């Protein structure tokens, strides 16, 4: 009878229940936090762009200036091989090969060439302006050329420059000036010819000891030719040295020379400024558009970081060295373990998420006589979703300051500066990378803690409604001391549960259950005594049987003494 009673006690019908839980899915997304690595979450957002299209494109609808085989110097001076660049429209950036073939056809140098390239990073269009027409030099020959710049086998020269030489065995002082009334700054380039020997000097200029003088309100430069024997380049032992200046509005530039002057025929009015740059690339322009260009290809993204290439032009994310930057937006993804039953711990007491709850992050599962089912808590889910969305957008917005990083060039005399610049840039990249990774780790920690807190808050909200009308099962579930139909369950979920309505029924059932527990104690004691006696008797019978068997086959000698 006692055994039957005990069985009935253990197989009593479970009361109606409601449980608090959270969403789980089949996601394999992993994030890192300050304290953990590779935490699987239900939802995440990658904020690091890793891809490009491998193309050189128009930037915001404006094509780049494609120099082809020409260098910056070849374009601006007018190398005959660069005639297609004599007039160019507005550009978004400049495409220059690493080692362009057509630069200074007449061998020489270009002073402050790297600074000139830096100037071009803020210019989007030059307008060519004739400042010193070739026919104004009536006392000098202006048809000078060289086979080094030949066109179709005939000697030629830089299209935008004029090489002044003797005329009629005479070279009078050459003077020219230009007043900048264009309304914009103007780029002016001129040159000085350095002959190979004195014979060449007299042949071209008649004079020895010549000079070239250039002056503006901010510039006073006087040069004399260096006559020297040099190794031949392009068949020439002489050299040309080019210089440049920016002529301000309403300022005047004056040229004076007794020989060796390479005069400018054209200046370049800076007609449009803006973010530009020189893209070192061997590629060609393709039929595509982008907002961010790298030497490897275009990036089209709204993400705040990328790891494609450190050099960019346009509206670009920040470059970082990271391989992974993923923000958690969902919860820890811990699907329920079937062997543990339906419920189980996020927030410290719920062991697994519900894949059956698909319309919210947090919610309920109930079971009663009418059935069972899942229901999301829309209010807490929506608040959490809005909060996390706003946070992610804020992080992206704060870190998505459009960033442009064009390469800086240094002359051979500035290698120490170049090395220092590289170290500084590497240092900045390290700082950006560290900041980005730390930001992600901290935000992920906060997001997961935020979800844990929301689940616990929902649990506490339900517990405050139900009070002692239920029993806390310790796994996120409550068992009612009263019958709770679907209407009752819905009232718990929407926060309108009527505690007084069920208080009396719950009190009676609670006391009854306690009485059953107390009366069952005697049963447990009887069963314990019965089990002990039965076990001892069974052991004694078994030992006696073994002894009798051993005595009968001689294995054990039995002596009975009286």
Swiss-Prot record:
It comes from Influenza A virus (strain A/Singapore/1/1957 H2N2). Residues 1-15 form the signal peptide. GO terms for molecular function: host cell surface receptor binding. Glycans are attached at residues 25-26, 38, 179-180, 300, 494. The record marks 340-341 as: Cleavage. SUPFAM superfamilies: Influenza hemagglutinin (stalk) (SSF58064), Viral protein domain (SSF49818). It is a single-pass type I membrane protein. It comes from the Viruses. Residues 547-562 are cytoplasmic. Disulfide bonds join 19-477, 57-288, 70-82, 105-149, 292-316, 484-488. It is found in: Virion membrane; Host apical cell membrane. Binds to sialic acid-containing receptors on the cell surface, bringing about the attachment of the virus particle to the cell. This attachment induces virion internalization either through clathrin-dependent endocytosis or through clathrin- and caveolin-independent pathway. Plays a major role in the determination of host range restriction and virulence. Class I viral fusion protein. Responsible for penetration of the virus into the cell cytoplasm by mediating the fusion of the membrane of the endocytosed virus particle with the endosomal membrane. GO terms for biological process: clathrin-dependent endocytosis of virus by host cell; fusion of virus membrane with host endosome membrane; fusion of virus membrane with host plasma membrane; viral budding from plasma membrane; virion attachment to host cell. Keywords: Clathrin- and caveolin-independent endocytosis of virus by host, Clathrin-mediated endocytosis of virus by host, Disulfide bond, Fusion of virus membrane with host endosomal membrane, Fusion of virus membrane with host membrane, Glycoprotein, Hemagglutinin, Host cell membrane, Host membrane, Host-virus interaction, Lipoprotein, Membrane, Palmitate, Signal, Transmembrane, Transmembrane helix, Viral attachment to host cell, Viral envelope protein, Viral penetration into host cytoplasm, Virion, Virus endocytosis by host, Virus entry into host cell. Palmitoylated. The chain crosses the membrane at residues 526-546. This is Hemagglutinin. A lipid is attached at residues 551, 558, 561 (S-palmitoyl cysteine). One of its GO terms (cellular component) is viral envelope. The keyword Lipoprotein applies. The keyword Glycoprotein applies. Pfam families: Hemagglutinin (PF00509). Belongs to the influenza viruses hemagglutinin family. Major glycoprotein, comprises over 80% of the envelope proteins present in virus particle. The extent of infection into host organism is determined by HA. Influenza viruses bud from the apical surface of polarized epithelial cells (e.g. bronchial epithelial cells) into lumen of lungs and are therefore usually pneumotropic. The reason is that HA is cleaved by tryptase clara which is restricted to lungs. However, HAs of H5 and H7 pantropic avian viruses subtypes can be cleaved by furin and subtilisin-type enzymes, allowing the virus to grow in other organs than lungs.
């Amino acid at each position: 009878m006692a055994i039957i009673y005990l069985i009935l006690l253990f197989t009593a019908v479970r009361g109606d229940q409601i449980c608090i839980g959270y969403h789980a899915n089949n996601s394999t997304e992993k994030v890192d936090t300050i304290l953990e690595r590779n935490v699987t979450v239900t939802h995440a957002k990658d904020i690091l762009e890793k891809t490009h299209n491998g193309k050189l494109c128009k930037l915001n609808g404006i094509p780049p200036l494609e120099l082809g085989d020409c260098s910056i110097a070849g374009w601006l001076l007018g190398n005959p091989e660069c005639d297609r660049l004599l007039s160019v429209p507005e550009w978004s950036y400049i495409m220059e090969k690493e080692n362009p073939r057509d630069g200074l056809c007449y061998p020489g140098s270009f002073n402050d060439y790297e600074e000139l390239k830096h100037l071009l990073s803020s210019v989007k269009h030059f307008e060519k302006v004739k400042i010193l027409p070739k026919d104004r030099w009536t006392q000098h020959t202006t048809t000078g050329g060289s086979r080094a710049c030949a066109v179709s086998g005939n000697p030629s020269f830089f299209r935008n420059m004029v090489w002044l030489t003797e005329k009629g065995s005479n070279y009078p002082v050459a003077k020219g000036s230009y007043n900048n009334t264009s309304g914009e700054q103007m780029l002016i380039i001129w040159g000085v010819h350095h002959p190979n020997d004195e014979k060449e000097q007299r042949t071209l200029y008649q004079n020895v000891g010549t000079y070239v003088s250039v002056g503006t309100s901010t510039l006073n430069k006087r040069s004399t030719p260096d006559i020297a024997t040099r190794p031949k380049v392009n068949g020439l032992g002489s050299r040309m040295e080019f210089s440049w200046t920016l002529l301000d509005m309403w300022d005047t530039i004056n040229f004076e020379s007794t020989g060796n002057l390479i005069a400018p025929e054209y200046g370049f009015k800076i007609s449009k400024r803006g973010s530009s740059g020189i893209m070192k690339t061997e590629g060609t322009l393709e039929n595509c558009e982008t907002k961010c260009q790298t030497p490897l290809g275009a990036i089209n993204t709204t993400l705040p970081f990328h790891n494609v290439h450190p050099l960019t032009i346009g509206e670009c994310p920040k470059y970082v060295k990271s391989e992974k930057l993923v923000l958690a937006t969902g919860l820890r993804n811990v699907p329920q373990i079937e062997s543990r039953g339906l419920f189980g711990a996020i927030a410290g007491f719920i062991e697994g998420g519900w894949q059956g709850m698909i319309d919210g992050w947090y919610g309920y599962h109930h079971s009663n006589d009418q059935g069972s089912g899942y229901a999301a808590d829309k209010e807490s889910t929506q608040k959490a979703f809005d909060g996390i969305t706003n946070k992610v957008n804020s992080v992206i917005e704060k870190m998505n300051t459009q960033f442009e990083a064009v390469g800086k060039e240094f002359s051979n005399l500035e290698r120490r500066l170049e090395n220092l610049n590289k170290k500084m840039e590497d240092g900045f990249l390290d700082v950006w990378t560290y900041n980005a990774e730390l930001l992600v780790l901290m935000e992920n920690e906060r997001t997961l803690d935020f979800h844990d807190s929301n689940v616990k808050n929902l649990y506490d909200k339900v517990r405050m409604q139900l009070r002692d009308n239920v029993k806390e099962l310790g796994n996120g579930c409550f068992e009612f001391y009263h019958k709770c139909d679907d209407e009752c369950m819905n009232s718990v979920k929407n926060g309108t549960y009527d505690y007084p309505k069920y208080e009396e029924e719950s009190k009676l059932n609670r006391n009854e259950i306690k009485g059953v527990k107390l009366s069952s104690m005697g049963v447990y004691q009887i069963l314990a005594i019965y089990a002990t006696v039965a076990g001892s008797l069974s052991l004694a019978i078994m030992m006696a049987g073994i002894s009798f068997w051993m005595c009968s086959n001689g294995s054990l000698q039995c002596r009975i003494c009286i």
